[in-house]
A protein has these predicted regions:
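N-terminal glycine-/serine-/threonine-rich phosphate-binding loop
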Residues: 16, 20, 31-35, 56
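Boundary/entry segment of secreted carbohydrate-active catalytic domains
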Residues: 1-25
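Generic detector of short alpha-helix boundary/capping microenvironments
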Residues: 7, 30, 70-71
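Active-site-proximal flexible loops/turns
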Residues: 15, 27, 86-88
Length: 147
């Protein structure tokens, strides 16, 4: 594991970046991006995920590639918010959106949903969930923000 003092400026900048790709496997141009620019982190979307076992294998592959090219373990991220913003397929654990959980009036439900999501993502090799988010519903016609 490398320290910041051992890194070049380009390598330090690469640690501040997260990159994603199309498809279930990283294409060659994505792997080249990691190698050339020392991209240190990965963001995954629904387009990258078939099921839990495939996601786990993908995360292991990505982790190995980034570690070999940068000397640093990456954050593998996703935004599994719940509700309409879910990245995991229906065969995996999915939770209601934040507005629906809040409507129950029980803070314990929010904790339980967060814990369940964290456990599911961790079991698949994801390190960092970019959720919850604090969306402001200032437009009632916005289809993304809602129950």
């Amino acid at each position: 594991m490398r320290t910041l003092q051992e890194m070049t400026l380009q390598e330090k900048l690469g640690q501040r970046l997260a990159a994603g790709f199309q498809g279930l496997e990283p294409p060659e141009e994505f792997l080249r991006l990691i190698k050339e620019y020392k991209v240190g982190n990965i963001i995954l979307f629904r387009r990258n995920i078939q099921d839990g076992p495939q996601l786990k294998k993908l995360c292991a592959t990505l982790r190995k590639v980034v570690e070999e090219e940068t000397g640093v373990t990456p954050f593998i991220t996703i935004d599994q918010e719940g509700g309409v913003v879910t990245r995991l397929p229906e065969s995996e654990v999915n939770i209601p959106g934040a507005m629906a959980v809040a409507a129950t009036g029980n803070p314990r439900n929010a904790y339980d949903m967060g814990l369940l999501t964290a456990q599911e993502l961790r079991s698949c090799g994801v390190d960092f969930n970019l959720a919850p988010v604090m969306d402001i519903n200032c437009n009632p016609d916005n289809p993304v923000i809602g129950v």
